[in-house]
Amino acid sequence: VIFRLSRFATSTNIFVAIALSIITVPSETVYDSIFQTLKRTYSDSESLAVKAVAIHTLSAAAVFGGASDSELEEIMDDLLEIVESDGSSIEAADSGEVVTAACEAWGFLATSIDDMEEKTEAAMDAFVEQLASSDVSVQVAAGENIALLFEKSYTARETDDGPASDEEDEEGLPIDTSFVKRYDVYRQKDQLKHTLSQLASESSRRIAKKDRKVLHTNFSDILNTVEYPSRGPRYQNAINEETGRRYGSRMVVRIHKTGTMKIDAWWKLHRLQALRRVLGGGFVVHYENNEVVFDSLPIMISAS
């Protein structure tokens, strides 16, 4: 199969088709067979759109095509270099499209790595810097990775951790203590919270109204997670009068007319978004019939 074609549209379509086929018919050897082609494409292609699609295809090939943990981490290092250089490392200087793709692919790969402690410091520095990007998509993708890194710094409470203590949030309501903090994510946490708070309330008229809304919605969630890492995307702080507790995560995916799937953690959102980039409107069909997709998001379906 010839992957490198001269026509821009055909090339992007081929890479989407490759990713779709990998998810539909997974193979433990496909990553080894196409890694070099995909890396060469996103490094050398003159089309920014092709670079971005090749980056996403590589992340799908790595996760579903048999890459080892060390290979996943090597790709993540390469993607982080793209982010740190604002795209310059692959001849895509200041391309929001390419840097966004690198951030998104990095986050998707990170969901497959159990222990992120050693990679967290360099990653946080890169993603915090991108919060100042002039491209809203870059800002959001970087912010979602920051939230994921805070989430991954906590793991399930084990016997050695002792019993959970009763902890309360700023309004005196109980905090989930079933997860325990294992390491610090970022030294300048107060400064980070200030930056996230500014983005969550961005009011500059220089930014389009729809982009301001995107910033407000996403960075309110990200700030909430940085403050309380057990809280996932679209966590509703409002209190349910019947239970006396916060409503919690309100992000759901409707599965036909019969049920909903709750996306209450950042790793779930990263995987959902990665699958949707490839599967588009066919996600629900694949979720019901494709074991690979279901195993990526093994979430119980609730009756709606």
Predicted regions and their residues:
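Long C-terminal extensions of eukaryotic subunits of large macromolecular complexes
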Residues: 182-189, 193, 197-304
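Helix-rich alpha-solenoid scaffolding regions
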Residues: 2-46
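Short coil/turn segments at helix-helix junctions and helix-capping linkers
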Residues: 3-10, 40-50, 85-97, 129-140
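Hydrophobic residues within the alpha-helices of tandem HEAT/HEAT-like
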Residues: 14-25, 41, 54-66, 82-83, ...
